[in-house]
UniProtKB/Swiss-Prot annotation:
It comes from the Bacteria. Keywords: Aminoacyl-tRNA synthetase, ATP-binding, Cytoplasm, Ligase, Metal-binding, Nucleotide-binding, Protein biosynthesis, Zinc. The gene is cysS. Monomer. NCBIfam families: cysS. A motif ('KMSKS' region) lies at residues 266-270. This is Cysteine--tRNA ligase. Its cofactor is Zn(2+). ATP binds at K269. Belongs to the class-I aminoacyl-tRNA synthetase family. It catalyses: tRNA(Cys) + L-cysteine + ATP = L-cysteinyl-tRNA(Cys) + AMP + diphosphate. GO terms for cellular component: cytosol. The lineage of its organism: Bacteria, Bacillati, Bacillota, Bacilli, Bacillales.
Length: 468
């Protein structure tokens, strides 16, 4: 059936068809770099990086663009408070953002444009809208004529009359209509500005993404994505600007991830539950944070708590332990000619891969895909119970675990110190091997643990262990 994605525009799950066969043009709204990102900001980075990875896994050539908003009211305020330039603030937090994403194993975008580097294109875009009658200048500001775009509200599914009624609460004498939004802001004291046909000023927020998407991906793109908080007004305004400027459909698929709560409450500084992504990565490890995020469907809200993180850690531990156990058995697995057992394992492995693909094809359902990975672990563990295992089959399970977890951006093959739970699992396996009089396997586990610096002591009360 192929990949299907839930399109916010239609509110339906739709078959995924690209503008150009085999190629995907994808734009994801990036951060405003005035501070370190919080854990909620990390969610779209992780889920849409996973989408990108899966599209590549399925054979697509993906061009992934994520912008950096490096000029904004908040940036200007921080720069003025610190007595530095806006660029200095932006550079500092852009570097921090990229470092945070690296710790979460989020691949860098193919293109990471910045607003300050796109000013000429933004001015050209605004001028084009004015010339087409979709925008107007008012005392140095430039506004978009929302009423000229009859489809305004089609992404957020809000009737234009309702939007207009709500906008009347805010009175701005510069606007022709309360719902009109700013494309270019006239200069104010203490702000960074650029020269334009309308005088000194700087861009409005919404026009920036439209201009950067046009510059680096063209008039039409396949996927535009971001958090649900961006549906209105940001993405709604992007559509209005872009489609009025080009006369073409801006994006085929609009994807939005659900929000993240902390202990079932909205994250806010006033509640004292404002958690930075870097702090959590340092405390729990970026791989665990990523795994936790992917345990829920990307479109649904997700709740963060230390209890849930601990549960996620247990799940991730099951996967890494299975891979470790497989790698340990590889040394003693025997090379053999194909037989009925080998054919059965090949069939099981093939079916598991197909199930994983089916779940990911279904609107990138990482939650169900992880369930399939747990089934891989289960089948691998069942196979390892055999006294004699084949090298081909052990390696096939290892390769499958790496293949599927890499799609999710997890690195289970990285050499790591044995976790306590992994040591306990190996000791339990050794005990079972001794009960079954499989002394070769028992000695193999002891030697393996010794190589990892783990000393075993057999006592009347059971096996004790310690690190050298």
């Amino acid at each position: 059936m192929g990949i299907q994605l839930t399109n916010t525009m239609t509110r339906r799950k739709e078959p995924f068809h690209t503008l150009e066969p085999g190629k995907v043009k994808m734009y994801v709204c990036g951060p405003t770099v005035y501070n370190y990102i919080h854990i909620g900001n990390a969610r779209p980075a992780i889920v849409f990086d996973t989408l990108r990875r899966y599209l590549k896994y399925r054979g697509y050539e993906v061009t992934f663009v994520q912008n950096i908003t490096d000029v904004d009211d908040k940036l200007i305020r921080v720069a003025n408070q610190e007595g530095v330039t806006v660029k200095e603030v932006a550079d500092r937090y852009t570097d921090a953002y990229n470092a945070d994403l690296k710790s979460l194993n989020v691949s860098p975008p193919d293109i990471q444009p910045r607003v300050m580097q796109t000013i000429p294109e933004i001015i050209e875009f605004v001028q084009g809208l004015i010339e087409k009658g979709f925008a107007y200048e008012s005392e140095g500001d430039v506004y978009f004529r929302t009423g000229r775009f009859q489809e305004y509200g089609k992404l957020s599914h809000q009737p234009l009359d309702d939007l207009q009624a709500g906008a009347r609460v805010e009175i701005n004498e510069k606007k022709e209509h309360p719902l009109d939004f700013v494309l270019w802001k006239a200069a104010k004291t203490g702000e960074v500005t650029w020269d334009s046909p309308w005088g000194e000023g700087r861009p409005g927020w919404h026009i920036e993404c439209s201009a950067m998407a046009l510059k680096f991906l063209g008039e039409e793109i396949d996927i535009h994505a971001g958090g649900t908080d961006l549906v209105f007004p940001h993405h709604e305004n992007e559509i209005a600007q872009s489609e009025c400027f080009t006369g073409k459909v801006f994006a085929r698929y609009w994807l939005h991830n659900g929000m993240l709560n902390i202990d079932n409450e909205k994250m806010s500084k006033s509640l004292g539950n404002f958690l930075l992504a870097r702090d959590l990565s340092e405390k729990f490890g970026g791989q665990l944070i990523r795994f936790f995020m992917l345990q829920g469907h990307y479109r649904n809200p997700i709740n963060f708590s230390e209890e849930l993180i601990e549960q996620a850690a247990n799940g991730l531990d099951r996967i890494t332990t299975a891979y470790t156990n497989l790698s340990h058995r590889l040394d003693t697995a025997r090379a053999e000619e194909p037989n009925d057992q080998a054919q059965e394992q090949a069939r099981i492995i093939g079916e598991l891969r197909e199930r994983f693909i089916a779940e990911m094809d279904d609107d990138i359902n990482t939650a169900n895909a992880i369930t399939v990975i747990f089934d891989v672990v289960k089948e691998a563990n069942l196979y390892l119970r055999h006294q004699n295992v084949g090298e081909t089959e052990v390696r096939a399970y290892m390769d499958l675990l790496v293949e599927l977890t890499e799609v999710l951006g997890l690195d289970i093959a990285e050499e790591q110190e044995l976790l306590d739970s992994e040591i306990d699992a190996l000791i339990e396996e050794r005990t079972e091997a001794r009960k079954a009089r499989n002394f070769a396997r028992s000695d193999e586990i002891r030697d393996l643990l010794a190589a990892k610096g783990i000393v075993l002591e057999d006592t009347p009360q059971g096996v004790r262990w310690r690190r050298k």
